Amino acid sequence: STAGAGASSPAASYPARLAVELKQRFPNHAIAVLNRGVNGEETDQMMDRFSADVMAAHPQLVLWQVGTNSVLRDRSLEIHEAQLHQGIEELKAAGADVVLIDPQFAPAVNAKAETADMIQQIALAAKQENVDLFRRFAVMRNWYDVQHLAFADFVSPDQLHMNDWGYACWAKLMAGAIAEAASRPIASAAAHPAHATNLP
């Protein structure tokens, strides 16, 4: 999803839309959104690129989407858990704030038996590592279950990736969550770390 699969153009991808949303919210700040997503990669493959593709840019904030490809390929949840914690610790050691992004609510993902366990694992890792979590699965499930949108409204024809509308909404929600977190007093954020694990 980060790489832009499902979008009609690069400008409609989630990172591109996020850059637009953040610049609207922070007009007096220089903001750069770097897209380092590669389609199809799993957690360990992303971590192999951390040094060259992530740490070399000295990011202040890393939005890390994890879990989907591992679930689709029936990978070991135990191995994924260890990799996830290691990856978070590496990003934190590099001085970056971290937001985890869990899998999408889409037919191809929902069909896998271990999706719920993966969602729970990522949420627990965020809590244990005291990093933020954007609950994409819950947001998209709300669109379907509560707002009664059809999958075709926010998922591309491949039944996996989001479409332009879905990416635009995701970017808007993420930008709003980042803006809210940035406005928190430091003392308040430190006193209530659990609040940082429920974005949006």
Task: Report the location of each language-model feature.
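Short, solvent-exposed turn/loop segments enriched in Gly/Ser/Thr/Pro and often Arg
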Residues: 37-39
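Short glycine-rich His-centered loop
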Residues: 1-9
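Alpha-helical cap/lid subdomain in secreted, periplasmic
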Residues: 16-32, 41-200
